[in-house]
Amino acid sequence: MAKNWEVNLLDGVPVGPEEPALVAAFLDQHDFAEGTRRLIGLDIKQFARWFAEANREKFMVGRVTMRDVLDFRDHLRREKGQAVATVNRSLVLLRRFFGWLFEQGHIAANPAKGVKQLKRQPLAPKGLDRAQVRRILREVELRQDLRANAALSLMLYAGARISDVVGLELHDLELNERSGSATFRQGKGNKQRTVPLPLPCRKAVQAYLEVRPPIKSAAVFVGERGPLGERGIRAIVEKYGTICGIDLHPHLLRHTMAHRFLEDNPGDLVSLAQILGHSNINTTALYCQRTQNQLGEASEKLNY
């Protein structure tokens, strides 16, 4: 018999009417240890909350696609910085949960079945080179795509995550001729950081705001029908990656900003950590890892 906490597990998450009972039944029908049961429940809740926020709709098991599971995997790895083993554990759980739903006839297919686990590899993040960035921004300018220019600029100049861009509201922006900033908010605790916006970024955001559709929404990035979710922002980024022949995703732009910042401000990990919103400076230190060529060039400069 399902326990009270299992039935109420999804409280606070926008879900369909059947979902709480389905999750409780899944947990109840498997012989999990109590501690494992709670961890699995929290993993499902984490996915449900992400789904609702990313797609701006209630979490309903029949609405989940393989694309959602792939995006969630990327969210855990790139946005939340979870270890490969932690991400893979979540994928195994989702595959089991949706597999059970499929076997019970609640969904037509298991959306997690074909999603591959991540391979263990060094975490040194890569960034775009300057020529690639110029090519992307040139294509945006040629198409006079002011919304794309603003979104890409926030990632390239302010190190914004895709969730930062989606969650940014009009009152979070301070823009004037001499300076400007954006306040990004994260998660249930409304953790926030205020990041200065360089002149090119301020100009890009201001130009977009002047043509932004006048809909009743506080969100900065909107379409004619309402605020853009993570899918909408990701589509913008991937569109210009395709145009430029680059495997482009939102977090690659954030990595690029971090690399350029350290090139111009060598060793200033504290400032970069504040901009990126890293609570652990060891995460920021990954951007200091050098390639063999860079190490060789640095060694050649030694002179006694």
Predicted feature locations:
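Conserved catalytic core of the tyrosine transesterase superfamily
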Residues: 1-304
